[in-house]
Amino acid sequence: RSMQYKCRPFFVFMGKTEEFCCPEIQTHILHDKMIMKKEKTYSRAPLPFVGQKRMFVSEFKKILKHFDDKTIFVDLFGGSGLLSHITKRERPDAVVIYNDHDNYRERLENIDRTNTLLRDLRKIVGIYPRHQKITGKMREAFLERIRLEETTGFVDYLTLSTSLLFSGKYAQNMEELEGLYFYNKIRQSDYRCDGYLDGLEVVCYDYKELADTYGVFPGVVFLVDPPYMGTDISTYKMDWKLADYLDVLL
């Protein structure tokens, strides 16, 4: 459905750097492979993310066609960037602003490290039965390998959680991971994110600030997709309460 903000259309769906033309906002334009030809369109985010809208991709594409005269799309609650990605693929002529408040881009930039870590864990687990609980020496070997990864840089604990923890459980750091049970759910293939953010202009701002900045521009469509009521927001880098829902709706 639609709503109005300073008389601008809203759509509610509940590595080279440059400056964008809006002086108040610094953006990072990822256009190593600008969309000059037909490129892959992802139907789900390349890395796990709580609340990505992969089940609504086909409907979202249909709704985008109603805004074929608009020139700027601002994804206020960018999340995994899936809506921004699809918008840019469907509308390569338009400017698409992806508000990466959860720093999903950092996870994508470290995808090779994540793949290497998971490959090493697959070697440790060997032919151990799938979905079985991991205990004893094997569990300690897992923890030792993950600790080693921490000493050399970034560890994507959210992605790691989907390979080791019971469904719906997530750890955000080593301490939390050590306190949870492990299961052999390790992904059997590498993750890929080729071209996922191509053409997007990536920012990291409070959604209110972004709405105020772009609300004065003509031809702007805001993609407003906040966390669902009742969703576990512990994996998000923002505090979200009932009052925030009311603020968005009003």
Residue ranges, per PLM feature:
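Conserved hydrolase catalytic core segment
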Residues: R89-D93
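Cysteine-centered motifs
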Residues: C7, C21-C22
